[in-house]
Amino acid sequence: MQSISSPAASAPPSSLPLQPSLGSGDSRGWRKLVSFPVLLAVILGTLVYAFDSGGIADPDIWWHLRNAEVLVQTHSMVRSDLYSFTVPGAPWFNESWLSELPYYFAWQWMGTLGLFLVMLLQIELIIFGVYGLAYLSSKNVKAAFVASWLAVWLATVSFGPRTLLAGWLCLVAELFLLWQFREGKDRSWLLPLLFAVWVNVHGSWVIGMVLFAIFIGSGLIQGTWGRLEAVRWTPAQRSKIGLMGILSVAALFLNPYTYHLVFFPFDLGFRQKLNISHIEEWQSLDFHDLRGKILFGMLAATIILALVRKRRWRVEEVLFLLVAFYSAMTYSRFLFLAAIMLTPLLAKELDFLPPYNPRIDKYWLNALLIVAMLAGCARYLPTRERLQRNLVKQYPVKAIPYLQQLNLKGRVFNHCLWGGYLILNARNVPVFIDSRIDIYERGGVFADYLDAIGIVKPLEVLDKYHIRYVLFEKNSPLTYLLRHTSGWKINYEDGTTVLFERVGSVP
């Protein structure tokens, strides 16, 4: 675990979370490693581990692995559909190609456990980064911990082996660089480099660019409006941050797909209507859910404390808060975004908590607790067998050997969330659909899929695509219908999966 460095050597001892004043150099180094702030960081890390120690069942990861395999083996980018029989050869751009590679190499080396470890490492780094941002904002390690503890609960919405995590890691890095610039520590030259990486790991770069634009714009005005204030950039600051903004936009085009990758987030937002309206994580936030209640509580606490304490807010802080809250309310997947953005603001309002005092720190007790938590995490590290058992509950794992041996002579209609798993593990079976919804929505396939599983016109869709086999969840309306429809028989069935075959000729 990395310690949080002191913002200024002249600060009073009570504000320096990692600066014990007594002892030799070796003793001071040891005390930093087992100090109370580090203990709090380990508690946060253990909480993340507890929430995230069960599974890797994200439907996208499987086709991400196949894409990375194509890149590594052929040294060329995937530029069209290679896996389906419904949209074969259709143009497609892999907007997460760079963030797929760590998962792929870990999977090659350690299998499903490698996927879990890469996922866990990214989430831990994000949460530690949020904890650091909260401390920089509040200068109070206890306030930072309380706010970050709440953030972990919101972040669970995106726990899984997802390329999105790399995007949130880039966001944390951006916020750190912007904070430094506002505080007079100019490392803004790193921002174009950051966006050059970000555009190749995930489409969430567009959020970072919006926040960057807000940050630049907030320094173009000067004034005070009640408790809202704006401080104008100096001419040197304005020139520097403006130049970095231009270079960051230009850096977005440093990708294998050039402008296609830059336009992808806008295509998703404005053209992929079925995708947005039918995929669960794109649904509006449910305030009956625990995460919804926590988000509301964090927002309410931030606002109420700000009113009671009469603190002034900078323009960019208010706008950042509005962007985060609106995004999370509109699309539940952005709860992680809200966790990252809201935590430093809440921590700032909690800075009335007693500050950390290294003179009364219990270093040996901290060390004992840290070792106990790390040992517990190591002891309960999920095995490959445990991860595999969890996969069996959600994917047609047991059916794969049967599909490979059967030598299917016809097209297969499959569950959307199983498509990626089939792409990786049943390569002799071209899929009907998978979770790359964008390519299937453009071709009209996703609309037909919804008609089939919604029992609007299931038999007509199966006939339209000349389907011989249906591989689907055991307990679903479609499987119930086919069980009671003449012309279909069951070839295979287990606790998760049913494989139907059409009796007679295919239309």
At which residue positions do the language-model features occur?
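Transmembrane-helix signature of polytopic, membrane-embedded enzymes
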Residues: 42, 130-153
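Short hydrophobic/aromatic helix or loop-helix immediately within or flanking a transmembrane segment
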Residues: 86-113, 117
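Juxtamembrane membrane-water interface segments that cap and precede transmembrane helices
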Residues: 93-105, 263-297
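Transmembrane-helix motifs of polytopic, lipid-linked glycan transferases
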Residues: 117-137
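Membrane-interface alpha helices of multi-pass inner-membrane proteins
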Residues: 151-155, 176, 188-203, 247-251, ...
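Membrane-interface transmembrane helices that cradle and orient dolichyl/undecaprenyl
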Residues: 172-188, 305-309
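Membrane-proximal, lumen/periplasm-facing interface regions of secretory-pathway glyco-
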Residues: 359-406, 417-419, 426, 435-437, ...
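Luminal/periplasmic acceptor-recognition loop/helix of membrane-associated glycosyltransferases
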Residues: 413, 430-475
